[in-house]
């Protein structure tokens, strides 16, 4: 059989019919993929899906026959496709599924090594009182009169959370948890909704989750990539309710993140989470949340503070507090903080309020003293050159007067700089201690003006396995 006949035979078997000329031209370079899909052991796949059903969807009334029918329907879907774009999307998604499901989700139901529940036992009550005082001093804006469009949570979240707990244990090298669930592991008084994760293969994982939900429940979920959040993908159900989301980061970034293990799951070091929390308070909507979520924010902040005090040996009775001078250029959207008091590997930090300006500088600087891109962990790059650190501050900037930074933003900018130091384990001791102590004596000042953050451009991209749509 000559090469053309071999290719035609593979395409014919895949489509269940002879290809038309356009289909042949498009699919002739895809024959290796098509062969893998054709030869995929769907009986073993059905067995893995069924085990996932009994492990993570126990209360769902669905028969084996229904699951088998959905699997068969999807793996013959190409026979009913008439548009080349849809056909290519089916090939891409089927290939991803057959090559990744077993090692991504299939392994979650295999026998695992025993693990022993572990926790760090700390008394958070004292720090919760301090957190109350901090939030009171941060309560400097009026409640918003605008009705906020909070995302509605899908009923699928309960099932996905069960999957995520096991996934975090089995894939601890490539997936790490942060947010309310990670704090719940430290302090059982903290409630959580979905499980927030950073991982190195978010797209593959989320597509597999979408297929698992489709085959077991029959429900259609959609993956949406949001342009203004770096490498962020969210899953919505058929009613646009939130199922789960994930940030994707490089393995090199994952390896740098300070982390702790609890119950065989890695969580982002709570000190990193504390610094990001302080940083996010420079967002006006986060300050508005203090009115409606005071107790929830207090217990989370108190937990982060107590862990950081314990783990990083912060002396609360020291009289040393944050001492930074600054210059602000509102017109050019730049802020300079002077860290001369601290023994850092630079003297001042140059904060760009527009990310493109930082990227331009990095591109035209071939040689630096230090450079690191921490992706979604800090939402910025850091470059050090000639005793100056350059970085991008992604939040709004709050002013207390026409030309004075608000204390909340000074703390936020300092936290952003400290993220570099704590993650790279360089020179953070004095600055971290001073910041924590300064939180306890923040001057309560009204917000005079808000400098907006930069606007991100781009298009939402979507993956819809039901409609055979893949937009990269």
UniProtKB/Swiss-Prot annotation:
UniProt entry keywords in alphabetical sequence: ATP-binding, mRNA processing, Nucleotide-binding, Transcription, Transferase
Pfam families from the UniProt entry: Pox_polyA_pol, Pox_polyA_pol_C, Pox_polyA_pol_N
Domain of life: Viruses
Coiled coil: none
EC number: 2.7.7.19
One GO MF term: poly(A) RNA polymerase activity
Lineage: Viruses, Varidnaviria, Bamfordvirae, Nucleocytoviricota, Pokkesviricetes
Signal peptide positions on this chain: none
InterPro entries: PolyA_pol_cat_Poxvir, PolyA_pol_cat_sf, PolyA_pol_nucTrfase_Poxvir, PolyA_pol_nucTrfase_sf_Poxvir, Poxvirus_polyA_pol_cat_C, Poxvirus_polyA_pol_cat_N, Poxvirus_polyA_pol_cat_N_sf
GO BP: any one term: mRNA processing
Subunit and interaction comment: Heterodimer of a large (catalytic) subunit and a small (regulatory) subunit.
Active site: 194, 196
Function: Polymerase that creates the 3'-poly(A) tail of mRNA's.
Protein family per UniProt: Belongs to the poxviridae poly(A) polymerase catalytic subunit family.
Protein name (Swiss-Prot/TrEMBL): Poly(A) polymerase catalytic subunit
Catalytic activity annotation: RNA(n) + ATP = RNA(n)-3'-adenine ribonucleotide + diphosphate
Cysteine pairs bridged by disulfides in the record: none
Record CDD domains: polyA_pol_Pox (cd20919)
């Amino acid at each position: 059989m000559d090469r053309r006949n071999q290719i035609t035979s593979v395409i014919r078997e895949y489509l269940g019919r002879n290809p038309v000329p356009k289909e042949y031209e498009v699919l002739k370079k895809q024959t290796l993929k098509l062969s893998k899909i054709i030869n995929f052991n769907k009986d073993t796949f059905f067995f893995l899906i069924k085990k996932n059903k009994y492990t993570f969807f126990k209360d769902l009334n669905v028969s084996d026959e229904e699951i088998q029918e959905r699997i068969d329907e999807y793996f013959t879907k190409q026979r009913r496709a008439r548009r080349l774009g849809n056909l290519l999307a089916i090939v891409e998604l089927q290939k991803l599924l057959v090559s990744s499901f077993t090692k991504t989700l299939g392994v979650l139901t295999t026998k695992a090594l025993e693990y022993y529940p572990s926790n760090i036992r700390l008394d958070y009550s004292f720090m919760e009182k301090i957190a109350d005082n901090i939030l009171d001093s941060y309560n400097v804006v009026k409640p918003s009169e605008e009705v906020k469009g909070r995302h509605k949570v899908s009923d699928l979240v309960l099932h996905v959370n069960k999957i995520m707990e096991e996934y975090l244990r089995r894939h601890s090298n490539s997936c790490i948890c942060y947010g309310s669930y990670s704090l719940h592991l430290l302090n059982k008084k903290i409630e959580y909704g979905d499980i927030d994760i950073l991982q190195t293969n978010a797209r593959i994982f989320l597509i597999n989750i979408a297929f698992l939900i489709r085959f077991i429940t029959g429900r259609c979920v959609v993956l949406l990539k949001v342009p203004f959040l770096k490498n962020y993908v969210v899953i919505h159900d058929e009613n646009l309710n939130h199922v789960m989301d994930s940030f994707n980061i490089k393995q090199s970034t994952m390896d740098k993140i300070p982390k702790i293990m609890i119950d065989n799951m890695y969580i982002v070091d709570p000190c990193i989470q504390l610094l990001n929390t302080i940083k996010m308070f420079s967002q006006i909507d986060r300050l508005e949340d203090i009115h409606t979520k005071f107790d929830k924010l207090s217990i989370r902040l108190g937990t982060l503070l107590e862990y950081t005090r314990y783990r990083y040996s912060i002396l609360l009775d020291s009289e040393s507090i944050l001492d930074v001078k600054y210059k602000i250029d509102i017109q050019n959207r730049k802020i300079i903080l002077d860290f001369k008091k601290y023994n850092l590997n630079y003297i001042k930090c140059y904060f760009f309020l527009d990310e493109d300006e930082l990227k331009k500088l990095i591109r035209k600087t071939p040689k630096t003293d230090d450079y690191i891109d921490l992706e979604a962990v800090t939402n910025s790059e850091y470059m050090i050159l000639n005793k100056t650190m350059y970085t991008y501050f992604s939040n709004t900037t709050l002013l207390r007067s026409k030309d004075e930074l608000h204390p909340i933003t000074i703390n936020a900018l300092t936290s952003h700089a400290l993220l570099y130091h704590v993650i790279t384990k360089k020179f953070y001791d004095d600055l971290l201690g001073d910041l924590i102590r300064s939180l306890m004596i923040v001057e309560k000042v009204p917000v005079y003006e808000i400098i907006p953050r930069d606007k991100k451009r781009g298009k939402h991209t979507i993956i819809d396995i039901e409609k055979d749509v893949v937009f990269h």
